[in-house]
Amino acid sequence: MKTAALGMALALAAGAVLAGDQQAHNTLTAAEKAAGWKLLFDGRDLNGWREFKKTTIGPGWQVKDGVITLVDPAKADDIITTDKYANFDLVFDWKISKNGNSGVYYHVIETGDHGYETGPEYQLLDNAHGEPPLQQAASLFGLYAPSKDVTRPVGTFNHSRLVVDHGHVEHWLNGVKVAEYQIGSADFKARVAGTKFAHWPLFATADTGYISLQDHESVVAFRDIKIKPLK
């Protein structure tokens, strides 16, 4: 009995240590702060964001239980950061509804009617929806397909990373690098030329711009949005 009790006590102690080591959502560790990371979402409100070409955010976007959720696409638009970013390392968690579709744009400028006219898109998708590879989760939408599907089951959070460094871009999903490209390269330009993006002359031309969360008529949720500006 004493041996069993001791074993139980040790197990509980180990669990407490693990729980203590688990970082709270929407926070930065001391090491992250020292390395230059900053939060784009603090888990409480949408300060630091606004809708595209607006100064406010409609009721379709809500914050609850430490998560940004697009709950009513009919009452929302794409939201963008209030600050612009050039070169950066961006991480975020996201989950999508069944058959859902969304995305994260970068280097968005407020020219034209929509963010996708200027900003490349890190695609977010329920891959079970059956879209082609160029439109699957973690693709550069319409241009570069992910090398593999490492998405988690719909309704659970995925972890994404987007690195933009002087035109060299990496897409990561759940710890795996799945796409890599160079904006402005011959290959990139050739791919753009064969798509709808060719109709927008400012697409992927800005060296700096806003980061945007897409309203694509699907329920989507975000948390742990962090960015580290790069030189």
Language model feature labels by segment:
Residues 18-231:
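Carbohydrate-interacting regions of secretory-pathway proteins
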Residues 1-8:
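Bacterial N-terminal signal peptides that target proteins for export
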